[in-house]
Amino acid sequence: MAEISKSIMVLPVSLLCSAAFWIFRVETVICIARTGRLIASDFLHDFEPLKRAHRVGEFGRARVVFVSDGIPLGERLWNEIRSGSGIIFPRFPRLYRCMMPNGFVKRIYLTDGESSDERRRRFSLPAGVPPSQGLALPAPAMRSGLVLAPGERFALLNCQRPELFNSLRRASGIEPDQEYKDVGWENFSYQFPNLDNYANARAKLAQENYPVVDLWDVVGNPVTLFSSGASGGVTEKSERDELQTWLFANCEIFVSGTSGAWWIAWSLGKPTLIGDSMWLNFDMPMTMFVPILLWDKHEKRLLTLTEMWSGRGASIRRAIEDSRGRLEAVRNTPDELAAAIRELRALTRKELMVDEELQSRVLRIAKDAVGKPDSQKTLALVSQSFLSGHMEILA
């Protein structure tokens, strides 16, 4: 009887704590949205630093390191992006869609216990050297074999290799021959990229007169190089951090498969092409700013952006997964991709941050790509992010 009474007492307490926890989260989201500051949490376990910042109440003064899948960049680059607007919690897709319909997204991870000087030593460009001004190559670039003339424009290609995903699997305790389930996203299995399509991407960029720098060839595996468990000494890691920072700061266009690296390029105002392996997952922040353009097979038209932000958009994923569904995504041909590259090259950094103008350009390119309504269109994400090889956007 005593145990039952104890359970009855514990239940209201646990419910109250749970309610307070979720109310606090919603309050935090709304508070940040009102400040116009960009603070986001990738996963549930990242929430504690945000709580500390919330108690301080001055998000703009929080000590930050801009990170993407464990790849931090320097304080100087953070200063380049800190004036944006928006708030994204991947775990609150419907809530933030309602509050922040412009969909501006950046990921920021709040840190404690590290001074700005320490971060500058580890992650920033050399003191006094601004990014994106045709800098001479840093010493690590020379040793890596990278050949570029000072000030020469180039495209940065993030061609992900299968060994990256194998390393992720092993880190998750999954053998490479097992189906990989991304933590937190049910019923999701990863498909390896088609490396032939990266060769096609290189060819298309070459047609647009872009020398291509392959991030993996020059820097190596970002997952192992820029994580706490990175191999090599501090000097080696520091040099690679410096080189990667330089590449992102000075590239003129960024093309990649599924990777957090697109957050870095996008936040620096770099024209970026995206086609993501997780395209079905409409809870991913990238689909907020870079809309997947959907073709209604019954009405024979593209969904409007308003429809994508509306309640109808919430059922899009289910409709696509259902073979009888009426919605399918639009796939770009190589010609449309080349047109998108030319469009992106023409955009200024200011224009990249104007959501409506960018989306109108995206829609114009996509409408040209649709062609006949009954053609076999399967997938494309146009503009402002990256190509995923296995989606065969360039096939």
Q: What residues fall within each predicted segment?
A:
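Active-site and donor-binding regions of nucleotide-sugar-utilizing enzymes
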Residues: 4-114, 217-220, 243-246, 261-263
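Nucleotide-sugar donor-binding and catalytic loop/hinge architecture
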Residues: 20-28, 119-156, 160, 167-179
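A structural signal for short, well-ordered beta-strand segments and their strand-loop junctions
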Residues: 31, 61-68, 156-158, 209-216, ...
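A short, glycine/small-residue-rich beta-strand->loop->alpha-helix junction that serves as a flexible
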Residues: 34-47, 164-168, 186-193
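Short, well-ordered alpha-helix to beta-strand connector turns
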Residues: 85, 209, 250-251
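Leloir-type glycosyltransferase catalytic cores
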Residues: 102-144, 287-395
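Catalytic donor nucleotide-activated moiety binding site of glycosyltransferases and closely related
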Residues: 157-159, 165, 184-240, 356-364
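A donor-sugar binding/catalytic signature common to diverse glycosyltransferases
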Residues: 244-289
